[in-house]
A protein has these predicted regions:
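Residue-level signal for the nucleotide or nucleotide-sugar donor/cofactor binding architecture
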Residues: 34, 58-64, 92, 141, ...
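Flexible, glycine-rich beta-alpha linker
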Residues: 17-38
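Mid/C-terminal beta-alpha module of Rossmann-like enzyme folds, strongest
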Residues: 72, 76-130, 159, 163-166
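Active-site Tyr-X1-5-Lys
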Residues: 1-20
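A short C-terminal helix-loop "cap" of Rossmann-like NAD(P)-dependent dehydrogenase/epimerase domains
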Residues: 40-51, 107, 112, 142-144
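Conserved C-terminal active-site "lid" loop/helix of NAD(P)H-dependent oxidoreductases
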Residues: 63, 99, 122-153
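Substrate-positioning beta->alpha
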Residues: 3, 32-38, 52-74, 81-82
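Short-chain dehydrogenase/reductase
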Residues: 1-5, 26-29, 56-61, 91, ...
């Protein structure tokens, strides 16, 4: 990704092409794939998940907010030549996300406590270290720069975005 950005900036310098880089966290919304889709399916199946002790914070952005931001980048003259970190502006813990997905589907979440170090150890043994890190580690993006420069505010709050994603499943 970094190499691609470098190439874009070089092309911009040589040709005068206006470039704006948007760095994304996890994107969620209708038709989501990957780990979030697997998590939704586990909630649907009512499988108990050993994740209640996780105290991470992860930035995310809903597809509706991302589309709104990209339109703003195209239209706003101050976007050219900038790099923006973007998110919905509310960082979520894994248990909060699972609880909200469950509630949006009309279920109660089935989380139970399990030592995080042991969870990480077991996932590492079976070759799923990246997956467990995404569930347990924090990744927070500060979207203050994009809010100030473009006067952008995400039009859809996180809870509504998650509800829309789940309803679209």
């Amino acid at each position: 990704k970094f190499e691609a950005e470098k190439v874009l900036w070089e092309v911009s310098l040589k040709t005068g092409l206006e470039v704006t880089v948007v760095r994304l966290p996890l994107v969620y919304g209708h038709g989501v794939k990957g780990n979030l889709d697997r998590l939704i399916k586990l909630v649907q199946l009512g499988i108990p998940l050993p994740l209640s002790l996780i105290q991470n914070q992860r930035s995310m952005i809903g597809i509706d907010n991302l589309i709104d931001l990209l339109i703003k980048c195209i239209e706003h003259p101050n976007a050219a030549g900038k790099t923006f970190l973007v998110s919905d502006g509310k960082d979520l813990s894994t248990p909060y996300l699972i609880n909200y997905i469950s509630t949006s589907m009309g279920f109660s979440s089935r989380l139970f406590p399990f030592p995080i170090f042991l969870l990480k150890f077991l996932f590492t043994i079976i070759g799923k270290k990246k997956e467990v890190d995404r569930l347990t580690d924090s990744l927070k993006l500060d979207n203050g720069h994009v809010r100030r420069v473009l006067n952008w505010t995400p039009p859809v709050n996180v809870d509504e975005g998650i509800r829309r994603m789940v309803q679209g499943k």
